[in-house]
From Swiss-Prot:
Belongs to the thioredoxin family. DsbC subfamily. Its main location: periplasm. Residues 1-17 form the signal peptide. One of its GO terms (cellular component) is periplasmic space. Homodimer. Involved in disulfide bond formation. Functions probably as a disulfide isomerase with a narrower substrate specificity than DsbC. DsbG is maintained in a reduced state by DsbD. In vitro, displays chaperone activity in both redox states. Keywords: Chaperone, Disulfide bond, Periplasm, Redox-active center, Signal. SUPFAM superfamilies: DsbC/DsbG N-terminal domain-like (SSF54423), Thioredoxin-like (SSF52833). It comes from Escherichia coli O157:H7. It is found in: Periplasm. InterPro entries: DiS-bond_Isoase_DsbC/G, DiS-bond_isomerase_DsbC/G_N, DiS-bond_isomerase_DsbC/G_N_sf, Thiol:disulfide_interchange, Thioredoxin-like_fold, Thioredoxin-like_sf. This is Thiol:disulfide interchange protein DsbG.
């Protein structure tokens, strides 16, 4: 599951215009930012907000004199609050992060019209990145999945220069594939100093990776069938791998 803290940070800091009832205002003073209202069961009025790294729901009783902060469940045991938070907060923010990845500097591995898209943040010296690259071969080679790799230089001091060498090659995507296929043994023309252009790409990728809440590679992102952004950090197990590759 994608870390929520970064998604909440994407929400616009817009002051809630409607005058809040006194009980809700008292809860708001505890550091909660009210985002919108919604109709809640039982004649109550709901308020959707955020607090630190969490989405929160507040329920105002029909008499307007009491407010409850927390989850609401129905008779089937379904968490109505969490469903609302996912739909109204996390899902839209996740789609925005997906768009940021689409607009970033990535290397294509596979057919550009492959139906399943998977983004991967990878370091040239990351052994698990190489294993994931190998794991993905059946899906990529069959045209079912396209991997979009965002190179970063975070593991070793020589990582940035090695990543820059790949980016500066005649065909970066092909060079990256050959590098991973060789287990990192492909000879590269590693520069003594990373150019400003390549450093910007790496810095932008690392910033995006950080904004997504990941601090290790591979950091893998894909969309679920519900069109919500999902995250898998590290080498995925077989069950997770199947989900990532669209075998739901």
């Amino acid at each position: 599951m994608l870390k929520k803290i970064l998604l909440l940070a994407l929400l616009p800091a817009i002051a809630f215009a409607e005058e809040l009832p006194a009980p809700v205002k008292a809860i708001e003073k505890q550091g909660i930012t009210i985002i919108k209202t919604f109709d809640a069961p039982g004649g109550m009025k709901g308020y959707l907000g955020k607090y630190q790294d969490m989405g929160v729901t507040i329920y105002l009783t029909p008499d307007g004199k009491h407010a409850i902060s927390g989850y609401m469940y129905n008779e089937k045991g379904e968490n109505l609050s969490n469903t609302l938070i996912e739909k109204e907060i996390y899902a839209p923010a996740g789609r925005e992060m997906w768009q940021r990845m689409e607009q970033s500097h990535w290397l294509l591995d596979g057919k550009k019209d492959a139906p399943v898209i998977v983004y991967v943040f990878a370091d040239p010296f990351c052994p698990y990145c190489k294993q994931f690259w190998q794991q993905a071969r059946p899906w990529v080679d069959s045209g079912k999945v396209q991997l979009r790799t965002l190179l970063v230089g975070v593991i070793k001091p020589e990582s940035p220069a090695t990543a820059a060498a790949i980016l500066a090659s005649k065909d970066p995507a092909k060079t990256w594939q050959e590098y991973e296929a060789s287990g990192g043994k492909l000879k590269l023309n590693v520069p003594a100093n990373v150019s400003t252009e390549q450093m910007k790409v790496l810095s932008d990728n690392e910033k995006l990776m950080d904004d997504l809440g990941a601090n290790v590679t591979p950091a893998i992102y894909y969309m679920s069938k519900e069109n919500t952004l999902q995250q898998a950090v590290g080498l995925p197990d077989q069950k997770t791998l199947n989900i990532i590759m669209g075998n739901k």
